[in-house]
Amino acid sequence: MTITVLKSAPGLPPAPQGDAADVVQVMLARLRAEGEAAARDYAARLDGWSGEIVVSPDQVARASEQVPEDLKTQIRYAHDNIRRFAEAQRASALDFQTELRPGLIAGQKQIPLAAAGAYVPGGRYAHIASALMSIATARAAGVGQITAVSPPQVGRGVHPAILYAMSLAGADRILALGGVQGVAALAFGLFGAPPADILVGPGNQFVAEAKRQLFGPVGIDMFAGPTDSLVIADSTADPLTVAWDLVGQAEHGYNSPVWLVTDSAALAEAVLAHIPGCIADLPEPNRSSAQAAWDALGEVILCTDREEMAATADRYAPEHLHVQAADLDWWRGRLSAYGSLFLGELTTVAFGDKASGPNHVLPTSGAARYTGGLSVHKFLKTVTWQQVAPQALPDLARATATISRAEGMEGHARTADIRLEKLRPTLRQVGTG
């Protein structure tokens, strides 16, 4: 593979190891022992919130009145797309049964989880879309009870637009809690919520670490890191559009990588020339975030042809993969490692982040090599069942007993033998023994 790196990523300075893990471990131990009292104390000390933790329907209604009507309209538009896509996913998850041999019947069944916990970030940015992505998807899957948490703002509580989105998407219970205490409330079933079977939704390093430490007794959507995006662009792409797509994703934060992969040196140089102006056009703190991410983690890679571009993209396995190149059908068929694929100049990643329909909770840090993003399937248990009739028993019992004894598992073999012996008289009568 012959590639040229036109802009390299020097990377971030080493982060202190163990700090977040140690802090989270101590917090979870206290929350597990002291429950709601500890959660209230952390909310007061860390978020400056001493108000009600459980958000009542009346509070949601009053908060919704503060949301501008145009914003409500656009939230409903996004919710409708997300819900429709999730419902289509649910329809694709089918129960079935099949007769493998005469009398040997097996099947598959989809069972929704009893309870889900959705974490909705609310720090520097009000992540309205995250509420829709997590809650609407769980609702489409048929989850029994959905509890949502989001960090309260000092003197105000949960952001009104987030509350509106949570309610619209179908949350059964909303808690004004953020950080580790919010995740713990979902996992442990605090404030009247049932303990969650799965924890979903993005968050900062402490939220991600809390989910990691809780995983096992409770499921999680994924181990998520900073968001990342890769743009594939050929000579047909518009350099200014590509530059804005890179900068628009870099504004997520100083630790959000963005990569451009192209086979056009002219396009690469033009994009590099546009980047500073695009960053300068952003307001603060977005400008500083985008600049830091671009300086430390932005890369521009020049390849010889589209096959090399595709191979490079697959090696990076980005969370978001945006193709602005000719022959989109070829790219859709060739690319194989990404969280979500955005095809064509019109299909900016921001559409997927906010409103187009497919879920924006996606694998990061190269995890797209082996897994996909949040979907209704995360809220479903795909279980199997089997049933044996007399005519299937002789062959099945012999195979089981023989394999079991070859493995040294005599007890397993006896469970097959005893059934064959009990049915042998009947099997002789029907001529199958």
UniProtKB/Swiss-Prot annotation:
Key words, A-Z: Metal-binding, Oxidoreductase, Zinc
Database matches in InterPro entries: Ald_DH/histidinol_DH, Histidinol_DH_CS, Histidinol_DH_monofunct, Hstdl_DH
GO biological process entries: L-histidine biosynthetic process
Enzyme class, UniProt record, top EC level: oxidoreductase
Disulfide bridge partners, by residue number: none
Alphabetical list of Pfam families matching this protein: Histidinol_dh
Cofactor, free-text remark: Binds 1 zinc ion per subunit.
Matching Gene3D superfamilies: 1.20.5.1300, Nitrogenase molybdenum iron protein domain
Gene Ontology CC: one annotated term: cytosol
Required cofactor(s): Zn(2+)
GO molecular function: histidinol dehydrogenase activity; metal ion binding; NAD binding
EC identifiers of the protein: 1.1.-.-
Active site as annotated: E319, H320
Keyword presence, Metal-binding: yes
Binding site for Zn(2+): Q249, H252, D353, H412
Family under the similarity heading: Belongs to the histidinol dehydrogenase family.
PANTHER family named among the record's database cross-references: HISTIDINOL DEHYDROGENASE, HISTIDINOL DEHYDROGENASE HDH
Protein name, UniProt field: Histidinol dehydrogenase homolog
Provenance organism: Ruegeria pomeroyi (strain ATCC 700808 / DSM 15171 / DSS-3)
